[in-house]
């Protein structure tokens, strides 16, 4: 959504430019040597803050990607304190808008019977300002997504370690990961 977007260097939320993205994807799809076409990450805040131009891009993704594609969204943490301390660029409200947007277009089944395009969600443990309540906020967000009937293709939970990051409670991290896998992944995925 940010490839050749307007204001990439100047704006907090650059305005997506569908034309160059469409050109790349339609061109790639026309290549007979290509069997599978997927993308990697998308910025949910860009989608949420620019719904109109994002619609055309999302339709192009759904039309050209192989079914089972994932558009990973890096929320990292649902905790506003962690968001602020680490200069994260997406908040839970923006994330929900972007997930709903991708669900609106991407849940259609492809040739292999899989949804064409679903969002993935990335969490990072060990960011500055994180507490046990941060994990609770992450779980609450996931519960909301499940309650709203929104689909995710996968949930990635990683931990960051090293200089500049805080130590994490291994017990809190394990409990969070276990709850996500048992209470969210199984019914949602």
What are the roles of these predicted feature ranges?
Residues 84-86, 134, 168:
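A generic "cationic amphipathic patch" detector
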Residues 52-58, 127-146:
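Catalytic cores of alpha/beta
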Residues 1-120, 125-128:
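Conserved SAM/AdoMet-binding glycine-rich loop
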Residues 30-34, 106-114, 136-139, 143-189:
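Auxiliary Fe-S-binding modules of radical SAM enzymes
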